[in-house]
UniProtKB/Swiss-Prot annotation:
Positions of disulphide bridges: 25-102, 28-96, 56-69
Official protein name in the record: Countin-1
Extent of Low complexity compositional bias: 233-248
Keywords per UniProt: Disulfide bond, Glycoprotein, Secreted, Signal
Subcellular location: Secreted
Naturally occurring in which organism (per UniProt): Dictyostelium discoideum
Compositionally biased intervals (Gly residues): 249-258
Role this protein plays: Cell-counting factor that limits the maximum size of the multicellular structure. May down-regulate the expression of gp24, which mediates cell adhesion.
GO BP, sorted A to Z: actin filament polymerization; adenylate cyclase-activating G protein-coupled cAMP receptor signaling pathway; cell motility; glucose 6-phosphate metabolic process; glucose homeostasis; hypotonic response; intracellular glucose homeostasis; maintenance of cell number
Record note on quaternary structure: Component of the counting factor (CF) complex, which includes cf60, cf50, cf45-1 and ctnA.
Chain positions carrying an annotated carbohydrate: 121, 215
Keyword Nucleotide-binding among record annotations: no
Amino acid sequence: MNKLFSLILALFLVNSAVVSSLDSCSICVDFVGNSLNDLLNIILNSGVIGTCGDLCSAVPGGQIVDTVCDLLCDYVGVDEFIKLISDVDPDPIYICEKISVCKTNDNAAASLDLVQINPQNGTVGGTFTLSIAYTVTNTIATGQLAFNIIDPTGNAFGDAVLLVQQSPEQYTQQFQFQATPSEQESFPNGLYTVQALVCEGSCGSPHPNTYTLANGTTTFTISGADSSSMSGAGSFSGSSQSTQTGAASGSGSGFALF
């Protein structure tokens, strides 16, 4: 949450009355994504919540988080805010679109130019770099660039970055992960499939204004796994880093399509 605090504080200190739509959308998605579980627990355990202040004052994180929560909640009203947070499939991007902080574009368009992983033949414990290049041909209002990696047993892990007001041009993104076995992902020997997606809205979300604009795949292999540790299921829990070029807004978050 420190990154979120710093961004919000800087914006308020520079000019509390002027926050660009791009910054506002990113702040909203970060806040909802980071605070969603806390908000759900407060809603479920607090009984009747009469005001935004009642709800937001209980969210951990201090005065800045309280203020952001109040601003978003007051905009739509406490009842509608609670309804959005309590959705059966809560989605930070969709919630921020419904609050009218993030924009949508049903005509967004993009193509994938490159999906490449290095090394293509690696070992357990090694570091892998996934490079993705894509071209936006009609502005992505609020969306994601996401990837999923499926291991030889069918388990999947992935990541995604937020895209806000990406105008037509080419963009590149790199993700890194370390193939360190854990209870969640054992990194067995064999062939792995990489899926990359560019989306308007959250990739894989069932909500309106969500579209897969482009997708592509590649493969790589891992060897050197201890056969005694080749069981396990769940999502990736190793280290992950991402870098991005182009006029894009991005933030990392856990992601899985399946």
